[in-house]
């Protein structure tokens, strides 16, 4: 159960991967999307919505990852639309809030926490309450696990999301004479895009050459980004699958400037394509970003630290290549088959 499905995100990609792998192993999997909330005083709209049926979109509606599961969008958030099941998985805090109120026959509730959302959502108090739910919780990093234990007294199973090595790979790394630095654009301030741009500008101001490569799904026309940065750069809008892989492979360094991440799949994907990683300590990234070993890590919002680490890789080819190789090995430690087996095991244990 999710609260949206159109937006390309690391979390959504991971959830679709888990769901489709479970389906391919013979499990019956259904994918429900919550209805958009209706204001409490609009009883007319609530009545109309309650008379509608679930809208089912074909699997190919998801055009940015492989998917064989129809998307079922609820007309209104009511238990009558949810079938009886063995397991019910909530994802975003909105889904956990709804799922926790459903009767037991809708399935044993698992809350798959992909981020500590109360850090950035407008509905902080509501999100915080969901972490106190007594259901079983799965998290994608020890950083989230520690937050749940320290702030809510809740334990959780850690299931680090792997990278699909059949999709993200690099047959033979080719290094660019002028290093290409890749980063993600996002309009959430905590994604740190502006910090990353400032770090890149500082590196350029100190006389270093680089080619900036930015990708994202928020802006089809990158001109506002060019205007804000004060220079133009290579931009890719909603790259998916092979286009995304080729973009990673063409770059030398991946720059992550987020303030916090539940895990940070874009950095992992880039590392699988043999990019060297320069990142802030986002919390979740510590599953794979080991400072001076698999990445160069600075503190969040530390633009000086980010620019310093970028310069180190621009000036030190041996360090650049060693981080690439060790980072690649680290990412390969995470395996989809093992993760799915662990997930199924958790589900089975809850039913005994």
Which sequence ranges carry the predicted segments?
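Nucleotide-activated donor-binding/catalytic signature segment of Leloir-type glycosyltransferases, i.e.
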Residues: 222-245
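Short glycine/serine-rich donor-binding loops of glycosyltransferases
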Residues: 264-267, 285
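Short alpha-helical donor nucleotide-sugar binding micro-motif in glycosyltransferases
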Residues: 246-251
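Conserved donor-binding/catalytic core segment of Leloir-type glycosyltransferases
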Residues: 138, 172-191, 197-201
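Conserved acidic donor-binding segment of nucleotide-sugar-dependent glycosyltransferases
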Residues: 291-292, 296-303, 312-317
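Short hydrophobic beta-strand element within catalytic cores of glycosyltransferases
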Residues: 276-279, 289
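A short, well-ordered alpha-helix in the C-terminal region of glycosyltransferases
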Residues: 305, 312, 319-333, 342-345, ...
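Aromatic "clamp/platform" in nucleotide-sugar-dependent glycosyltransferases that forms part
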Residues: 259
């Amino acid at each position: 159960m999710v609260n949206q499905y159109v937006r390309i995100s690391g979390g959504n990609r991971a959830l679709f991967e888990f769901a489709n792998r479970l389906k391919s192993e013979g499990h019956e999997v259904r994918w429900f999307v919550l209805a958009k909330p209706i204001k409490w005083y609009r009883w007319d709209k609530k009545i109309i919505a309650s008379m509608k049926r679930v809208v089912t979109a074909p699997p190919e509606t998801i055009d940015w990852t492989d998917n064989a599961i129809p998307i079922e969008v609820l007309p209104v958030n009511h238990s009558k639309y949810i079938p009886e099941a063995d397991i019910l998985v909530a994802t975003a805090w909105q889904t956990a809030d709804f799922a926790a109120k459903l009767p037991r026959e809708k399935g044993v509730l698992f809350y798959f926490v992909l981020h500590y959302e109360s850090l950035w959502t407008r509905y902080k108090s509501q999100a915080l309450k969901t972490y106190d739910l007594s259901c079983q919780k799965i998290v994608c990093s020890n950083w989230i696990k520690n937050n749940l234990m320290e702030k809510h007294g809740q334990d959780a199973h850690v299931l680090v999301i792997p990278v699909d090595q059949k999709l993200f790979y690099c047959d033979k790394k080719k290094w660019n004479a002028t290093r290409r630095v890749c980063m993600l654009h996002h309009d959430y301030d905590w994604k740190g895009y502006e910090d990353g741009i400032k770090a890149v500008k500082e590196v350029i101001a100190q006389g270093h050459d680089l080619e900036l490569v930015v990708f994202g799904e928020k802006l089809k026309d990158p001109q506002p980004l060019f205007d804000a940065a004060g220079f133009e750069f290579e931009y890719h809008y909603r790259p998916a699958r092979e286009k995304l892989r080729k973009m990673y492979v063409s770059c030398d360094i991946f720059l992550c400037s987020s303030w916090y991440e539940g895990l940070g799949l874009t950095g992992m994907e880039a590392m699988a394509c043999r990019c060297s990683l320069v990142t802030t300590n986002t919390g979740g990234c510590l599953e794979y970003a080991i400072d001076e070993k698999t990445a160069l890590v600075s503190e969040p919002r530390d633009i000086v630290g980010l620019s310093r680490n970028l310069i180190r890789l621009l000036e030190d080819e041996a360090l650049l290549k060693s981080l690439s190789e060790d980072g690649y090995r680290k990412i390969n430690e995470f395996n989809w088959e093992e993760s799915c087996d662990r997930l199924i095991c958790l589900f089975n244990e809850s039913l005994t």
